[in-house]
């Protein structure tokens, strides 16, 4: 079988579990070696690392806070030292909380925006020079449908993800004529650790609204990332693809 990412090197932030973990495993299944940048340790990342090995690919786990400039720089340096190049960057690392706006602390605003948006900036900032030099690369930023429609008591999270979508469009306009494609994914309600923070009442109400009548699974987002990382998406630039079960129809 012809693998879509054969011989490629991918960096996946937040790749130790959840959506990022599924993306990392799907990339390996399609022939890529994967650098996982995450705050979780090797024990927590073991299922993903084992799956990558089972696909016959190499992996590197680098403990990284994506909001920290020096840690991101060190992670990218480690990726180049191990693999020599970076073909694909997936910015999936993120954080989440809920708060009525009138009670939202400045420190919590800063924390969420720093991880979700500053982290995307930093990873792109340190990966992009190598891609520009080679005139080749794919950048995939994981946003959220709440960046498109907003979420109640989630102004900070929604703003950070809307920023990711805007960042994606602006960077795509700047670098697409240099062989680098930048796109985003805005998942809908996916069964991740973040969604586990929601109440049973919210879940029941949301399920009743969904055209498909069920929440999505992390593995259902991964094929979108494979598509955007491969040559199958050769004419996609600055787009936001939405695996959301029909929850939002644009």
Regions found by a protein language model. Give the residues of each.
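Active-site helix of classical SDR
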Residues: 124, 160, 168
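Catalytic Tyr-X3-Lys loop
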Residues: 95, 102-121, 136, 140, ...
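Substrate-binding pocket helix/loop in short-chain dehydrogenase/reductase
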Residues: 100-101, 108-113, 195, 202, ...
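Canonical Rossmann dinucleotide-binding motif of NAD(H)/NADP(H)-dependent dehydrogenases/reductases
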Residues: 5-35
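A conserved structural motif in NAD(P)-dependent oxidoreductases
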Residues: 210-221, 232
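Residue(s) in the substrate-gating loop at a strand-loop-helix junction
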Residues: 144
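Alpha-helical segment proximal to the catalytic Tyr-Lys
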Residues: 129, 173-177, 234
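Short C-terminal tail/terminal secondary-structure segment
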Residues: 149-152, 226, 237-250
């Amino acid at each position: 079988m012809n693998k879509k990412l054969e011989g490629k090197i991918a960096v996946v932030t937040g790749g130790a579990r959840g959506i990022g973990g599924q993306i990392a495993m799907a990339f390996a299944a399609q022939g890529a070696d994967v650098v996982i940048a995450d705050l979780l340790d090797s024990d927590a990342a073991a299922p993903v690392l084992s799956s990558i090995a089972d696909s016959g690919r190499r992996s590197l786990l680098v403990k990284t806070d994506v909001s920290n400039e020096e840690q991101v720089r060190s992670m990218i340096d480690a990726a180049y030292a191990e693999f020599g190049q970076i073909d694909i960057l997936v910015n999936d690392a993120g954080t989440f909380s809920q708060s009525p706006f009138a009670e939202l602390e400045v420190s919590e605003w800063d924390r969420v925006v720093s991880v979700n948006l500053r982290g995307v900036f930093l990873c792109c900032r340190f990966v992009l020079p190598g891609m520009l030099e080679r005139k080749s690369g794919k950048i995939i930023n994981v946003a959220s449908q709440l960046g498109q429609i907003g979420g109640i008591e989630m102004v900070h999270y929604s703003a950070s993800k809307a920023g990711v979508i805007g960042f994606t469009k602006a960077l795509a306009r700047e670098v697409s004529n240099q062989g680098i494609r930048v796109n985003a994914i805005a998942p809908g309600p996916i069964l991740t650790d973040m969604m586990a923070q929601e109440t049973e009442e919210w879940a029941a109400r949301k399920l009743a609204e969904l055209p498909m009548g069920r929440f999505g699974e992390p593995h259902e987002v991964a094929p979108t990332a494979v598509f955007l990382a491969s040559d199958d998406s050769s004419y996609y630039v600055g787009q936001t693809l939405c695996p959301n079960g029909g929850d939002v129809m644009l």
